[in-house]
Amino acid sequence: VAYENPVPAAAVIVCRNDEILLCRRGIGPYLGEWGLPAGYQEVDESIETTAIRETREETGLIIMLTGLHDVMTTRDDPRKAAILVIFEACVVDGELEPGDDCDEVGFFPLNALPEKLAFQNNRIILERLQKGERRPWPTNPNP
């Protein structure tokens, strides 16, 4: 029996002065489109470490996680399904510089985001933030 199980991934919401950190993808899928710093968990790390590592690799910034924003199951990536853990974070060090699979990074006002946004889950998260909706992880597990 073969199972197609989702893999763990992390994304990070980093805000600064009412602007949000986004990365333009330098590789496919969604080449040239913008999204949150994110990536798949490696076997020897926690999901929190994944979030910190991916943000550093993609943006040059060192972050501190400040909270758990949401968890989504997604099939946005044609390569594999994922369980996406979305964290909130603040910058503690580093210089903003694209790296890894991003060719440009920057902070954008929520009311002036790039037109081409990668991944449906990123669009959902950013639309909620634009509406002022915060979805910190619920204390009640019922929807």
What are these model-predicted stretches?
Residues E19, R134-R135:
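Generic structural signal for secondary-structure transition and capping sites
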Residues V1-I20, V71:
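Conserved N-terminal beta-strand and adjoining loop/helix that marks the start
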Residues V7-A9, C15, P29-L31, L36, ...:
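Short connector loops at helix/strand junctions that flank enzyme active sites
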Residues C15-E57:
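Conserved Nudix-box catalytic region and its N-terminal flanking loop in Nudix hydrolases
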